[in-house]
Swiss-Prot record:
The phosphoenolpyruvate-dependent sugar phosphotransferase system (sugar PTS), a major carbohydrate active transport system, catalyzes the phosphorylation of incoming sugar substrates concomitantly with their translocation across the cell membrane. The enzyme II CmtAB PTS system is involved in D-mannitol transport. The gene is mtlF. The modification Phosphohistidine is found at H63. GO terms for cellular component: cytoplasm; plasma membrane. Residues 3-142 form the PTS EIIA type-2 domain. InterPro entries: PTrfase/Anion_transptr, PTS_EIIA_type-2_dom, Sugar_PTS. This is Mannitol-specific phosphotransferase enzyme IIA component. Homodimer or homotrimer. Seems to be a monomer when not phosphorylated. Keywords: Cytoplasm, Kinase, Phosphoprotein, Phosphotransferase system, Sugar transport, Transferase, Transport. The active site is at H63. The PTS EIIA type-2 domain is phosphorylated by phospho-HPr on a histidyl residue. Then, it transfers the phosphoryl group to the PTS EIIB type-2 domain. GO terms for biological process: phosphoenolpyruvate-dependent sugar phosphotransferase system. One of its GO terms (molecular function) is protein-phosphocysteine-sugar phosphotransferase activity. PROSITE patterns: PTS_EIIA_TYPE_2 (PS51094), PTS_EIIA_TYPE_2_HIS (PS00372).
Length: 144
């Protein structure tokens, strides 16, 4: 999974004022990496209206609706580290992982991310990381 994280798609010390702004930043990074079309960003917002993507332990995993599968060019991940946190439906989120999965791969990606974040120590390491490499290492160790 760590191979889907490029250093260009890991953003440290992000400051956002809202959940919507965080979704837009994550979605734009997926667009910029060539993983999705622009329409996918709206699909991420649409999903959030139906069900929150807050996963617990300070993590949210925004992703598009099932109808948005046609907007996914290839699988991709982006990570926003938000040390100050952002309100996410009444919860504090410090890490946003935007995902786009091609050919049903999003369920596997969701599962691997959730497993990594199920350990509070991993969450702390990601929130406190000073480089993209440190964050990638947490995922590599969890995936081993």
């Amino acid at each position: 999974m760590s191979e889907l994280f490029s250093n260009d798609n890991i953003f440290l010390n992000v400051n956002v004022n809202s959940q919507n702004e965080a979704i837009e930043k994550a979605g734009k990074a997926l667009v910029d990496s060539g993983a999705v079309t622009d329409a996918y960003i709206q699909a991420m917002k649409d999903r959030e209206q139906v069900v929150s993507t807050f996963m617990g332990n300070g993590l949210a995993i925004p992703h598009g609706t099932d109808e948005a599968k046609t907007n996914v060019i290839h699988s991709g991940l982006t990570l926003l580290q938000i040390p100050e946190g952002v309100d996410w439906d009444g919860e504090v989120v410090k890490v946003v992982v935007g995902i786009a999965g091609k050919d049903g791969e999003h369920l596997d990606l969701l599962s691997k991310i959730a497993i990594t974040f199920s350990e509070e120590g991993n969450v702390d390491r990601i929130v406190q990381a000073k480089s993209a490499e440190e964050i990638k290492q947490v995922f590599e160790e969890a995936d081993a």
